[in-house]
Amino acid sequence: MHFLVALVLLGQIIGSTLSSQVRGDLECDDREAKEWADQAVRYINEHKLHEYKQALNVIKNIVVVPWNGDLVAVFLKLNLLETECHVLDPTPVEKCTIRPQQNHAVEMDCDAKIMFDVETFKQDVFVKCHSTPDSVEDVRRNCPKCPILLSPRDPHVVDSVEYVLNKHNEQLSGHVYEVLEISRGQHKYEPEAFYVEFAIVEVNCTAQEAHDDHHHCHPNTAGEDHIAFCKATVFRSHASLEKPKHENFESDCVILDVKEGHAHSHLIEHHIGKYSTSPGQNSTVECVAECPVAFVNKEVPTDISDRHTTPVKGCPGKILHFQL
């Protein structure tokens, strides 16, 4: 099974704290290289529309070249690892747990270009990333009974999420939630079960209206949104063809403190009322008109290329976590 996601991000960051004295002879483990990499990773996490925050794993290459006038171009090749924090989770990525290998880890390789003005400290950031999970063969070789990653669109995954959400809504008098995104699904063994992770938001519908396909529910007005991230296990066989009805399940939902104006507040409107499974697998995601305000609707420039990122001394840098 092979999953591919491409993120194409373009935006502006103003007020950089980086020194105006930009070194051009950086090695991948230099402190300044780490600062540039952190800028790119921070931008990815602030504008990523789906799934999980990413953490830096390896700086594979860095090249700093003079551009026009006061501009300096920084080209980076980065390897990132998926964390367990959803993009809506306000937890700083530095405090997020890296998804362990036995839980079917996912890596992301990114080409980044940062245009830095040494006079104004203004930055333009361009990033293109491809995400790939560890192979099923490697997971099973190292841990034969570990859960295997499934597509968020897998019928068992979708049915499990809907089943757990319906059970929660039945128990919450006066509150109705809808799925914002199905972020992860896994097939577990001994006992056989389906493990799912998904984000939900409180809507302004009654329980009856929520089950009416002709009624469109909307998130509560600003300041009243209850957003939660849920992890659940539904115990059922992969051979089951019917939707779950009376299966045993375990679940835990944590309310996320997403403030109005938070960098990801746009995600609610991006997801609600649309197909709620993550498009991150077997798909390409590009910035379009509905992207966050910081995005510009144009393609990433062609000068993020190998000719700017030929191997340099001291690269790649050290592996901060593990290599897939």
From Swiss-Prot:
First and last residue of the signal peptide: 1-19
Cysteine disulfide partners in this protein: C28-C315, C85-C96, C110-C129, C143-C146, C205-C217, C230-C253, C287-C291
GO molecular function, a single term: cysteine-type endopeptidase inhibitor activity
InterPro entries: Cystatin_dom, Cystatin_Fetuin_A, Cystatin_sf, Kininogen_Fetuin_HRG, Prot_inh_fetuin_CS
Known tissue expression: Expressed by the liver.
Function: Suppress hemorrhage induced by metalloproteinases from the same venom (brevilysin-H3, -H4, -H6) and from habu venom (weak inhibition of the metalloproteinases HR2A). The non-hemorrhagic brevilysin-H2 is strongly inhibited by jMSF, whereas the brevilysin-L6 is not inhibited. Does not inhibit serine and cysteine proteases such as trypsin, chymotrypsin, thermolysin, and papain. The inhibition may occur by formation of a non-covalent complex between this protein and the proteinases at their metalloproteinase domains.
Name of the protein: Antihemorrhagic factor jMSF
